[in-house]
Every structure is written in structure tokens, then in C-alpha cells.
Amino acid sequence: MTPLSLLDPALSEQDNEHWLRFVALLQQSIAEDLQLPLLQLLLTPDERTALGTRVRIVQELMRGEMSQRELKSELGAGIATITRGSNSLKAAPPALKSWLEAQLLSADKPLGDDA
């Protein structure tokens, strides 16, 4: 997938349309400060927990201080989930990796703080 591509090759055309509709809805909810209630409506508590865990997986993989097996023990995630995160991170566009580094690896910067 190229950095500017909106389509996910892993999804069908219809699923891509649904995905892009969700992304647009999420963007609008953020603009109107409704993202938390929207995500609570659309995602189960387990799904919200899983997303939080995936963010931590990406953060720790970028930090590079733990092996995938150590991450499995530390985060309680399956090795397949960690491996998928690692492979996705390797395939991510450089601009996204740089942005994630700024967001996730800045020790004093809380998530969501764009200042």
C-alpha cells in the first residue's frame, strides 16, 4: 500500500467503502469532540482493550528494548498479534513511522498532546 493509498488491499471493495466511511465518521467525531462516545458505542470493552494493547505493542516494538516473547509475557498478547504488529510496522510508510515515533516515544509527551 502506498503512503497516499486510501484503499486497503486486504479488504473487498465493499469493505473498503465501509472502512472509509468509518474513518470519515471518526474524523468528524474528533472535530466535534465526540470521539470517545462514538468509539464506546461502536466497540465492545474487549475491542477497546485490544486496541490499547496494540498501541502498546507498536510502542514497545519501536522502542526495541524487548523481544517479541518478552512482549508476549509483559502485555499478555498472543505471539501472532505481536508478529502481525511487527510485520505491519515494517511495512508502514516512513512518514507514519516518524509520526508514531513522535507520538509514542517522547517520554514527556502524553498521547493526544499535539503541542
UniProtKB/Swiss-Prot annotation:
Record keywords, A-Z: Cytoplasm, DNA-binding, Repressor, Transcription, Transcription regulation
GO BP annotation list: negative regulation of DNA-templated transcription
GO MF term list: DNA-binding transcription factor activity; sequence-specific DNA binding
Domain of life: Bacteria
GO cellular component: cytoplasm
DNA-binding stretch(es), residue numbering of this chain: 68-91
Any Pfam family hit: Trp_repressor
Covalent S-S links between cysteines: none
Quaternary structure, from the entry: Homodimer.
Role description: This protein is an aporepressor. When complexed with L-tryptophan it binds the operator region of the trp operon (5'-ACTAGT-'3') and prevents the initiation of transcription. The complex also regulates trp repressor biosynthesis by binding to its regulatory region.
The protein's name in its UniProt record: Trp operon repressor
